[in-house]
């Protein structure tokens, strides 16, 4: 019998602070029209000081667990895609693992910027197909607002903060 991976549950977390393009007009040589015509972006969410990458990832993970009707200890592994970890080490994935109270399995980060979640999902799929895990929490979480150059209009208008999570199951 062929093992297939399916998405069993999903969740997300967006910080409360919403920043629309007009806020950038005050500090940069730009306009809502310039930003939206080039990027399609009208608004983005920015994390506050307490909303770290691992905190947002944990909140998205809890929502995914609830959506899948699973408990945290049902999870065999966590793969977290991020380029904005809270610390150099430990990995953000192990911080989420601890936040959820998971004491078994493995957890690691994937750092591939925009493609990170896709790579994390591909990793999880391969682990499930190979029989190494049955339920994997795959998360993408970023806090780019904490490291952006606020004077570079070509980049600072593009990024926001948030987290999304899925549970991939055999």
What are these model-predicted stretches?
Residues 1-76, 100:
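Conserved "HGTGT" condensation-loop signature of ketosynthase/thiolase-family condensing enzymes
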Residues 1-22, 119-170:
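Conserved beta-strand-centric core segments of catalytic alpha/beta enzyme folds
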Residues 36-55, 82-136:
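Conserved catalytic cysteine-centered active-site region
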Residues 79:
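N-terminal Rossmann-like NAD(P) cofactor-binding module of classical short-chain dehydrogenase/reductase
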